[in-house]
Amino acid sequence: MAATTLTDRAVIRVSGEDVRGFVQGLVTSDVMGELPVWAGLLTPQGKCLFDFLVWSDGDDLLLDCEGDAADELIKRLSIYRLRRQIRIERDVEIAVHWSKDSGQGSADPRLPELGTRWLAPADGPATGWLEHRLRVGVCEGRAELGELLWLECNAAELNGVSFTKGCFVGQENTARMNWRQKVNRRLLVVIGGGERSRVEYPEVGLSVVHARVDAIPANAIVPDWLKDALAQPSTA
């Protein structure tokens, strides 16, 4: 059986008193219903600080996050904890697993084409995830999403925001952009690289750019799930 561990991911366990209520008031997606969901923790201005998948484990929540960002995410969440009886810590006994087509686990909540994920003790490192993710046009992590407005990260198209759940950090600007249908720039994956790339991945021949929707690069990968959004007229 092929190895499936995504070694660049970490798991944060949030446990204690009213964990779902605590996380619900902070992140962009609704964590009170069926999980997993993809969510962001934003600045008050609606810019992305961290993105992660939220899983349930009994009364606890597990955050499937970028490994290099895990400690900073814990610190950021702890700011909001105040006097709540809540613990936020790495769970080193659990790893994130991925398969393109094994059928094991749960479908990635962002896009079924991404494959399936599950949480379990680590095995060998998975191969092919980076290129597969980029080829279907999905961006993640601070290098790709960091400090961009959440809707510019294609969050609405990838099920990464709820406009009915109520307040979250950065909700006001995010909701305003959605109401005005004003998303002038988008994150896109392009073939090759260039001076305007946010991140380049020469090992797979792909890069991530932050482009105006009225000036999409000719070498951009435009997946079906994003075409309708890019067809909307931009505003100055």
Specify the residue positions occupied by each region the protein language model found.
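Basic, glycine/lysine-rich polyanion-binding surfaces/domains
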Residues: 1-236
